[in-house]
UniProtKB/Swiss-Prot annotation:
<feature type="compositionally biased region" description="Basic residues">
    <location>
        <begin position="1"/>
        <end position="15"/>
    </location>
</feature>
<dbReference type="GO" id="GO:0005739">
    <property type="term" value="C:mitochondrion"/>
</dbReference>
<feature type="region of interest" description="Disordered">
    <location>
        <begin position="1"/>
        <end position="42"/>
    </location>
</feature>
<keyword id="KW-1017">Isopeptide bond</keyword>
<keyword id="KW-0832">Ubl conjugation</keyword>
<feature type="modified residue" description="Phosphoserine">
    <location>
        <position position="402"/>
    </location>
</feature>
<feature type="compositionally biased region" description="Basic and acidic residues">
    <location>
        <begin position="296"/>
        <end position="311"/>
    </location>
</feature>
<feature type="region of interest" description="Disordered">
    <location>
        <begin position="48"/>
        <end position="67"/>
    </location>
</feature>
<dbReference type="Pfam" id="PF15440">
    <property type="entry name" value="THRAP3_BCLAF1"/>
</dbReference>
<feature type="compositionally biased region" description="Basic and acidic residues">
    <location>
        <begin position="220"/>
        <end position="242"/>
    </location>
</feature>
<feature type="modified residue" description="Phosphoserine">
    <location>
        <position position="17"/>
    </location>
</feature>
<feature type="cross-link" description="Glycyl lysine isopeptide (Lys-Gly) (interchain with G-Cter in SUMO2)">
    <location>
        <position position="400"/>
    </location>
</feature>
<dbReference type="GO" id="GO:0045944">
    <property type="term" value="P:positive regulation of transcription by RNA polymerase II"/>
</dbReference>
<dbReference type="GO" id="GO:0016592">
    <property type="term" value="C:mediator complex"/>
</dbReference>
<feature type="region of interest" description="Disordered">
    <location>
        <begin position="371"/>
        <end position="404"/>
    </location>
</feature>
<dbReference type="InterPro" id="IPR029199">
    <property type="entry name" value="THRAP3_BCLAF1"/>
</dbReference>
<protein>
    <recommendedName>
        <fullName>BCLAF1 and THRAP3 family member 3</fullName>
    </recommendedName>
</protein>
Length: 711
């Protein structure tokens, strides 16, 4: 447990020393420190890097080559300033410090209390590394950090502010931090050799609680690393502003976050802290000026953590495929193609972050790491096999390979191979049927080319490159040719053909004599116009034209028989109405039948049509009143308009039908029967047979017939 509080998530703190470090220190740290765990394990990376990593792994036991997976997954973030903070310990005894332009924006770490109280700021930084506890608001010590970044006088950090969030922590973690605080106070100043000689995992992580504690703080450098390597790929408009240092081109672009941080400090050791903040945070904020540097470090941490949570669920399940398909791109960027340097680093850092989230649990992280390596190997094998299969299909002469139609190509290759083999083997019915089934399946799939079928059938037509429209057009032309050769049509159009058929039909109709046997004319299929033209006879009377219907027609014969049947039924069906009401109505009818206006007599059946409205007793009074009104009004209308020969309106309608006034007794009798039929139709089953009113009804019927014949 000899490591100091330099594992804080604020990993961008520079040294307190005003003297910049030499380049050899960075070269020594650069060669193995900040490359991801997967990159060191990757068998596809260049040999020079593997040899370099193995050389450092042999010379320095704190970096095992393949040994301890837990320590390696934690230790691959070695850009965090642990060696620099060993040099910082000399300056930690100053409670206040001035502004020095040489140390850049690394002065955020040095403003705290002297060494005996530094366990408390370390706990605060660890709290900021948890994303679920830092989502709302940022602590006031971040504003102090912001003030020191501007170059102002940093206020002294109070112990009350440091203990403000301690209520959220567990008691076992506080107790463990006190133990660490005592161990930290014993080591006054440690050099870089203290870090390099320690290699035992038990001494570094004595308990699971230690690993949980350091595991969450170790997420911070990787998250910022991932955020810095992802943002330039999403914002390409300020990508040209960031020019990569030449040393970075020589190494690799798989882990650009800490690398950029180190080169920024190495190349500009004498610039002011404001300038360094703007240069160093250009990955995250493209237009950060001196006035815009008041973003606190805590807010930066929270933003990075929120971005990490947002993108880890989207891109986490895909990181294995991205690692497989981007190893070649990583090698290209190593050769010097720095056109898009951040895309490979983005994907690899996403993969590393995803793997480190699995390493939170100490017991299950080793198995998950091995499963991840195995899946990556399988994915690379699948990509290699698919590329090899694509190369094999490109060698075949009849197949046009494209990455979209890989399934179709494999089917085509299968058919072609079977076809070539089929020439050397004995043909059997089973093999030919199987071949035909494969060909039909190939046609059933909606592919552009039908050439497997045509090759099997040895067709001379080359329909491989013909689109579907031309194929259909060829079929249509073949059909027309067959029709012209084998099914010749007569030299007549359809209009002429059907017009001649109509003329023949009309000639057959006209040949029938009009006055022949009546049996011939009893046709039900006669048209109405034909019936009217043949059987209508003009009969001139004083008022109207009457159409006399031919009695030989079968339809009118049926109607006449129906009326006779209804007349016979009318003798036995009577309404529920009382005899007194019927006598009153009959007396009023006898008055009406003697009324004459200019030689015109009102039809006697007019009043009887009102009997169909007498269905229930409450309507009887209404019908009698309306009867009187109706009997007088039509004659007034007739008297007023007799010179204009206008028929009375009311007298022309019986049950919705327009019927003219007739003087013929036969016509009036038929109309009377029709009115009686309508009246009985509305009464329906309410009528009943009575012997009491039967004689009276027959007597009244005689009177009606006498009146009709007397006219």
């Amino acid at each position: 447990m000899a490591r100091s509080r330099s594992r804080s998530p604020r990993w961008k703190h520079r040294s307190l020393s005003p003297v910049p470090r030499n380049a050899e220190h960075y070269k020594q740290r650069h060669s193995h420190g900040h490359y991801g765990c997967e990159y060191r394990k990757d068998p596809k990376r260049p040999v020079a890097w593997r040899m370099d990593s193995e050389k450092h792994g042999q010379s320095k036991p704190r970096i095992p080559s393949r040994g301890n997976i837990y320590y390696q997954s934690y230790e691959h973030r070695s850009p965090s300033p642990n060696i620099r903070n060993s040099l910082e310990n000399v300056y930690m005894y100053k409670p206040h410090r001035g502004y020095s332009p040489g140390r850049g924006d690394s002065n955020r770490r040095a403003q705290y209390m002297p060494k005996y109280s530094e366990g408390i700021p370390y706990k605060e930084h660890e709290r900021n590394s948890y994303p679920q506890k830092v989502q709302g608001g940022h602590s006031p010590d971040d504003h102090r950090v912001r003030g020191s970044g501007k170059g102002g006088k940093p206020p002294q950090r109070s112990i009350a502010d440091s203990f403000r969030f301690e209520g959220k922590w567990h008691e076992d973690e506080l107790r463990h931090q006190r133990i660490q605080e005592e161990k930290y106070s014993q080591s006054t100043r440690r050099g870089s050799e203290d870090f390099e000689t320690r290699s035992s995992f038990q001494k570094r992580y004595p308990e699971d609680r230690d690993f949980r504690k350091y595991g969450h703080t170790s997420k911070r450098p990787k998250d910022v690393e991932r955020y810095e390597s992802r943002e330039p790929a999403r914002n390409p408009k300020w990508k040209p502003e960031h020019s990569l240092p030449p040393y970075q081109e020589d190494t690799d672009q798989w882990n650009l976050g800490p690398q950029t941080y180190r080169h920024a400090e190495r190349e500009h050791p004498e610039t002011s802290s404001a300038t360094k903040v703007s240069y160093d945070y250009r990955h995250k904020r493209p237009k950060l000026l001196d006035g815009d540097q008041d973003f606190s470090d805590g807010r930066t941490q929270k933003y990075c953590k929120e971005e990490d949570r947002k993108y880890s669920f989207q891109k986490g399940p895909l990181n294995r495929e991205l690692d497989c398909f981007n190893t070649g791109r990583g090698r290209e960027t190593q050769d010097g193609q720095v056109k898009e340097p951040f895309k490979p680093s983005k994907k690899d850092s996403i993969a590393c972050t995803y793997s480190n989230k699995n390493d939170v649990d100490l017991r299950s992280s080793n198995d998950k790491w091995k499963e991840k390596i195995k899946k990556e190997g399988d994915c690379r094998k699948e990509s290699n096999s698919s590329s090899n299969q694509l190369d094999k299909s490109q060698k075949l002469p009849d197949v046009k390979p494209s990455p979209i139609n890989l399934r179709k190509k494999s089917l085509t290759v299968k058919v072609d191979v079977k076809k070539t083999v089929d020439t050397f083997r004995v043909a059997s019915s089973y093999s030919t049927e199987r071949q035909m089934s494969h060909d039909l399946v190939a046609v059933g799939r909606k592919s552009e080319n039908f050439h497997p079928v045509f090759e099997h059938l040895d067709s001379t037509q080359n329909t491989e490159n013909k689109p579907t429209g031309e194929f259909a057009q060829e079929i249509i032309t073949i059909i027309h040719q067959v029709k012209a050769n084998y099914f010749p049509s007569p030299g007549i159009t359809l209009h002429e053909r059907f017009s001649t058929m109509q003329d023949i039909h009309k000639a057959d109709v006209n040949e029938i004599p009009l006055n022949s046997d009546p049996e011939i004319h009893r046709r039900i299929d006669m048209s109405l116009a034909e019936l009217q033209s043949k059987q209508a006879v003009i009969y001139e009377s004083e008022q109207t034209l009457i159409k006399i219907i031919d009695p030989n027609d079968l339809r009118h014969d049926i109607e006449r028989r129906r009326k006779e049947r209804l007349q016979n039924e009318d003798e036995h069906i009577f309404h529920i109405a009382s005899a007194a009401e019927r006598d009153d109505q009959n007396s009023s009818f006898s008055k009406v039948k003697n009324v004459h206006t200019d030689g015109f007599q009102k039809p006697t059946h007019f009043i009887k049509s009102n009997f169909r409205k007498c269905i229930e007793k409450p309507y009887m009074n209404y019908t009698t009143q309306r009867k009187d009104i109706i009997t007088h009004k039509p004659f007034e209308v007739e008297g007023n308009h007799r010179n204009t020969r206008v028929r009375p309106f009311k007298s022309n309608f019986r049950g919705g039908r327009c019927q003219p006034n007739y003087k013929s007794g036969l016509v009036q009798k038929s109309l009377y029967i029709q009115a009686k039929y309508q009246r009985l139709r509305f009464t329906g089953p309410r009528g009943f047979i009575t012997h009491k009113f039967r004689e009276r009804l027959m007597r009244k019927k005689k009177e009606y017939t006498d009146v009709a014949t007397g006219i």
